């Protein structure tokens, strides 16, 4: 800006290309071999890939974003081994996939580097009962969280099941408990604390004590001070993307 004599730069890492580029082919193999192939196609160097050993016989990705293809492959593995995965940049210019929630190594405590902490919980997305119906709208099964109903009251949804399908798994995914989140700020900054990893926080006033999952991170340098601001989650959730069946 000419008036303020301040130059502002906006920089993207190479995940920009993963998020905005399409792929158009049928992939096969393990996620840890599929993802480097995607990176090679886009001219991006690949880094460490979380090992799964899960073989995917066919994964059609016609006109899909590269990010979606990566998550489809690792979602297939997650269904078998129960792990959570996330792609991110490592060593400045390499796309890697790691097990989401891996401890970053940083610890934030009130007597050392923690300068601010907030905590909140909300019932806005609460769902603790799902009624599964047939095509004629008859209830054929109920999936519920009895403890949540007793504690918070009943919020239910209706899910229609298609012929020949079992909607139980989908109904379980629709259950949502109280959502808790927190934000913390710390000085000095620690570059190990980035989204996708987890961190240890020890702050007794808010009750933030234990391992939390970093959902977003901001690292600021101003007036000789390096500060990190983190948004934390209490659950380790993965951005799941299903492989679509071809007809």
Q: What is the meaning of each model-derived region?
A:
Residues 16, 25, 57, 124, ...:
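Flexible, active-site-adjacent loop/turn segments at secondary-structure boundaries
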Residues 39-44, 75-79, 201:
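Sec-exported extracytoplasmic/periplasmic mature domains
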Residues 6-18, 48-118:
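Short beta-strand-centered interaction patches in the first periplasmic/extracellular domains
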Residues 24-32, 62-70, 192:
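Solvent-exposed, acidic/flexible segments
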Residues 1-50:
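Surface-exposed cap/loop segments at beta↔alpha junctions
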Residues 1-13, 220-233:
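Short, solvent-exposed secondary-structure boundary/capping segments
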Residues 40-48, 54, 239-247:
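Intrinsically disordered, low-complexity terminal/linker regions enriched in Pro/Ser/Gly
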Residues 71, 83-222, 234-240, 247:
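Acidic, small/polar-enriched beta strand-loop surface segments
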């Amino acid at each position: 800006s000419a008036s303020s004599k301040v130059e502002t730069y906006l920089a993207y890492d190479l995940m920009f290309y993963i998020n905005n580029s399409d792929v158009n082919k049928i992939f096969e193999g393990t996620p840890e071999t599929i993802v480097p192939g995607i990176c090679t196609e886009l001219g991006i160097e690949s880094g460490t890939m979380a090992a799964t050993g899960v073989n995917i016989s066919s994964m059609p990705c016609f006109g899909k974003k590269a990010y979606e293809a990566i998550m489809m492959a690792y979602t297939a593995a997650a269904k078998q081994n129960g792990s959570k995965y996330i792609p991110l940049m490592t060593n400045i210019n390499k796309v890697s996939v790691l097990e989401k929630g891996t401890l970053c190594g940083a610890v934030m405590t009130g007597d050392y580097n923690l300068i601010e902490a907030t905590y909140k919980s909300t019932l806005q997305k609460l769902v603790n009962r799902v009624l599964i119906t047939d095509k004629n709208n008859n209830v054929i099964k109920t999936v519920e969280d009895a403890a949540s109903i007793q504690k918070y009251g009943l919020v239910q949804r209706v899910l229609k099941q298609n012929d020949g399908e079992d909607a139980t798994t989908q109904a379980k995914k629709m259950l949502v408990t109280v959502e808790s989140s927190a934000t913390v700020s710390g000085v000095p900054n620690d570059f190990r604390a980035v989204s996708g990893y987890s961190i240890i926080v020890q702050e007794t006033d808010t009750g933030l004590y234990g391992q939390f999952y970093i959902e977003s991170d901001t690292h600021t340098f101003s007036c000789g001070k390096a500060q990190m601001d983190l948004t934390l989650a209490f659950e380790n959730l993965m951005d799941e993307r299903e492989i679509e069946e071809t007809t």
